[in-house]
A protein has these predicted regions:
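Extended polysaccharide-engagement surfaces of secreted carbohydrate-active enzymes
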Residues: 1-239
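Beta-strand-rich recognition/accessory modules
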Residues: 222-282
């Protein structure tokens, strides 16, 4: 038992080292520095042990409908966790179902949850004047052929399928099946966009992101957008919005710092269909 505890401690040390390796002098906020300073009070040299993140490939499926897969430089996370909505600011709405991370480019698509912000939910449907942004049930199946997350809503069923990645491409699909008359339904992906960096589109749009709102239509986008070394291939009808400030439970309201803003790619769903998207690296 003692050796197992020691091994767990060594892995935690390596994981802390892994996380701090992503910090640079350009992305350290005062809040982050303060938290690191707190950790430094307890720092001491010690051994480390390999962790799954050090392996070229691995996957793990939890006992609940959530899992993670690493394929070379790519890490994808699927979450079908369902929780009863509450009014407490400390319990976020479990509305984000996909995250995509690249070891050199960082987080690209975030499945971060929020509060009272359906525009950041993976799916929304408007029924009887109300917007529903969380599934009623879910199921996750992970295999080497593909990872599939099924999500049930009131008027449709969606399967989010993540196919095996190559070194420079991670493809994923959304398969939509109406269960009756399809409500006003939208698909949304949260994109980790960085203020001060350039974003460009296949249709010729090119700007440096700042606090000015962007609401680009499908005519403005074309079939891809490019940002910070990655390109997102998007289906017809997609729209882009920036900036959107996620909910901060400590403020009990949206963030106010542009550094923490995200963008969204949204598509209106029209019936039984399959949407194919992919993230590619330069």
């Amino acid at each position: 038992m003692g050796s197992l505890r020691f091994l767990a401690l060594c892995r935690r040390s390596r994981y802390a080292e892994f996380l701090t390796s992503f910090f640079t002098t350009n992305n350290l906020s005062l809040e982050t520095l303060g938290r690191l300073a707190q950790d430094a009070l307890y720092f001491h040299e010690g051994p480390t042990a390999p962790i799954p993140q050090d392996q070229p490939r691995y996957h793990h499926q939890m006992s609940v409908p959530a899992g993670i897969r690493k394929s070379g430089p790519w890490v994808t996370c699927l979450s079908g966790l369902i929780a009863t909505p509450t009014t407490s600011q400390w319990y976020l709405d479990r509305q984000g179902h996909l995250s995509i991370f690249h070891e050199k480019l960082g987080l690209i698509v975030t499945g971060a949850n929020s509060k009272n912000q359906p525009e950041l939910a993976t799916f929304t449907e408007k029924i009887g004047g109300q917007v529903v942004h969380m599934p009623t049930s879910s199921r996750l199946k992970m295999s080497d052929e593909a990872d599939q997350l099924g999500l049930a809503y009131n008027s449709f069923f969606a399967v989010l399928e993540v196919v095996p990645a190559t070194d420079k491409r991670q493809e994923f699909h959304f398969v939509i099946t109406p269960t009756g008359r399809l409500a006003d339904v939208n698909l949304n992906l949260q994109l980790v966009l960085k203020a001060g960096e350039t974003i460009e589109t296949a249709a010729g749009r090119r700007v440096v992101l700042d606090e000015k709102p962007i609401r680009w239509s499908t005519e403005d986008l074309g079939n891809w957008i490019r940002h910070r070394g990655w390109t997102l291939k998007i289906p017809p009808g997609a729209r882009l919005a920036w900036p959107i400030y996620p909910f901060n439970p400590y403020r009990n309201g949206p963030e106010i710092d542009l550094v923490l803003a995200v963008g969204t790619i949204s598509c209106a769903l029209t019936g039984k269909q399959e949407l194919v998207l992919a993230v590619e690296t330069d």
